[in-house]
From Swiss-Prot:
CDD domains: YjeQ_EngC
CP-type G domain sequence ranges: 104-273
Required cofactor(s): Zn(2+)
Binding residues annotated for GTP, in chain numbering: N160, K161, I162, D163, G214, Q215, S216, G217, V218, G219, K220, S221, S222
GN (gene name): rsgA
Designated name of the protein: Small ribosomal subunit biogenesis GTPase RsgA
Compositionally biased intervals (Polar residues): 1-17
Family in the record: Belongs to the TRAFAC class YlqF/YawG GTPase family. RsgA subfamily.
């Protein structure tokens, strides 16, 4: 990170926000301000309960407490933090997070008990990793794409393990990927084993904060290892830093820096995006090629299934919309209805 001290105006706003929150809280201040130095900017590279690892402008990592006035803090957040003074070493903290800058984006996932939970912030793009083995699933890709469209975060589709394809297999896979290329999505074909195709992927990741999504077995960790230049497997629950704080077991998201530039957040929370909390209209909007036909159906309440005069079905029959995408659209709606039914049944049992 480049060194970027707070301006006087930013400092005044941070102080004003902090004081206002303290006044509206019935709790006393949680830490003595005299224990900490001047405010600086940083980025959260991981979060553990009421602690966070914050990377400062000079690249050092500091274990920090979090003010109770901060309601939400996740990996990727840009923050204002203060280092602990030398006299404060006895309290076993390196600093304290004082405030969180406004997010440009937030990656969330639904939770049956806690509603929609944020898991990472300021994401520029989501890299959807799929593979020909154990099975190339366009349905899973389509689910990820709906989530990306709903979150308004740019997706990139990466097909891994292409070294396992013969000429005929490569032709078939390219035909499948053309479905996505033809509707404007970027598709990259790579092999983490032979490193074929990694250069274009590196270029796509440079200067951006990305998060990788993919089911087990698609080689997501191997791909990250190759991009990060690591000799050992990434373990999301193996966290360490250069501040002498040792190892910590966690299931938290973690931010890493690519040697070629750019950052990646590795998180166990994005193996699969749940869509059950969305409305059917949001799923429909998540299929970008449907947009030109919405509002053209004969009936306003058209379900885009067997309804007469459905403009979307007519587009499928005319080859303007891929049939596999249309089928996956209905599979997603059916799976959503099933999950919501189970959730409602569970709620009535409580």
């Amino acid at each position: 990170m480049s060194k970027n001290k707070l301006s006087k105006g930013q400092q005044r706003r941070v102080n004003a926000n902090h004081q206002r929150r303290l006044k509206t809280s019935k709790e006393k201040p949680d830490y003595d301000d005299n224990l900490f130095g001047e405010p600086d900017e940083g980025i959260v590279i991981s979060r553990f309960g009421m602690h966070a690892d914050v990377e400062s402008a000079d690249g050092d990592v500091h274990r920090c407490n979090i003010r109770r006035t901060i309601r939400s803090l996740v990996t990727g957040d840009r923050v204002v933090w203060r280092p602990g003074k030398p006299a404060a070493e006895g309290v076993n903290v390196k600093g304290i997070v004082e405030a969180v800058h406004e997010r440009t984006s937030v990656l969330t996932r639904p939770d049956f008990y806690d509603g929609v939970k944020p898991i990472a912030a300021n994401i520029d793009q989501i890299v959807i990793v799929s593979a020909i083995l154990p099975e190339l699933s366009l349905n899973i890709i389509d689910r990820y794409l709906v989530a990306c469209e709903t979150l308004q975060i740019e997706p990139i589709i990466v097909l891994n393990k292409i070294d396992l394809l013969d000429d005929e297999g490569m032709k078939f896979v390219n035909e499948q990927m053309d479905i996505y290329r033809n509707i404007g999505y970027r598709v990259l074909m790579v092999s983490s084993h032979t490193q074929d195709g990694l250069k274009p992927l590196e270029e796509a990741l440079t200067g951006r904060i990305s998060i990788f999504a993919g089911q087990s077995g698609v080689g997501k960790s191997s791909l990250l290892n190759a991009l990060l230049g690591l000799q050992k497997e990434i373990l999301t629950n193996d966290v360490s830093d250069n501040s002498g704080l040792g190892q910590h077991t966690t299931t938290a998201a973690r931010l890493y820096h690519f040697p070629h530039g750019g950052d990646v957040i590795d998180s166990p929370g994005v193996r699969e995006f749940g869509l059950w909390h969305l409305e059917p209209e949001q799923i429909t909007q998540g299929f970008v090629e449907f947009h030109d036909y919405l509002g053209l159906c004969k009936y306003r309440d058209c379900k885009h299934d067997t309804d007469p005069g459905c403009a979307i079905r007519e587009a499928v029959e005319e080859g303007k919309i891929a049939e596999t995408r249309f089928e996956n659209y209905h599979r997603i709606l059916e799976s959503m209805a099933q999950v919501k039914t189970r959730k409602n049944f569970s709620d009535t049992d409580d």
